Regions:
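Structural motif
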Residues: 24-27, 45-48, 69-79, 106-107, ...
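Conserved active-site and cofactor/substrate-binding residues in soluble primary-metabolism enzymes
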Residues: 4, 8-12, 21, 53-57, ...
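Generic secondary-structure signature for well-ordered alpha-helical cores
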Residues: 6, 10, 14, 18-22, ...
Length: 151
């Protein structure tokens, strides 16, 4: 048992988050995403499933321990709605809120066309699939660094 960790963070998910390096992406995807197929091409080959959670809840847990890259102008990206790239579905607004809270500032999500998103997700470190069935709940989060003195 560990203290002060969100209980949503399983041992496998914590391993993935710890093993990622600065600049690695994590694909955080909805229940409709072809996660098994995409995960097999990622750096780690790992698919972590979080069934029964909303995307917002999963994002909150992950962002409680994952630093977002602040060297990158677009460290968090979202899958665009097919046929309406400017549309922001409710699931994306909810995750945007969690990202803004985690960063302490507004950081708009950059849009990526659906098939370009799949290509970028294949180059991610791992895939986390959430049980949220709402479409376009697909994100790429780029890991940043933790500043400080060695201990």
């Amino acid at each position: 048992m560990l203290r002060n960790l969100d209980p949503v963070l399983s041992a496998d998910l914590l391993w993935v988050l710890a093993a990622m390096g600065h600049g690695d992406d994590l694909a955080l995807v909805d229940a409709n995403h072809p996660a098994e197929t995409i995960a097999s091409s990622t750096t780690s080959g790992r698919l972590i499933r979080l069934p029964g959670l909303t995307m917002q809840r999963a994002a909150r847990a992950i962002l409680s321990v994952l630093p977002i890259d602040d060297f990158e102008p677009e460290p968090v990206r979202r899958m665009e709605v097919v046929g309406d790239a400017a549309a922001i579905p409710d699931v994306q607004r909810a995750v945007q809120s969690e990202i803004d809270k985690a960063l302490g500032r507004s950081s708009p999500l950059a849009g990526i066309e659906r098939f370009a998103f799949y290509d970028q997700a294949r180059r991610a470190f791992a895939v986390v699939q959430v049980g949220d069935p709402r479409p376009y709940g697909c994100f790429l989060l780029r890991k940043g660094v933790i500043a400080g003195e060695p201990g």
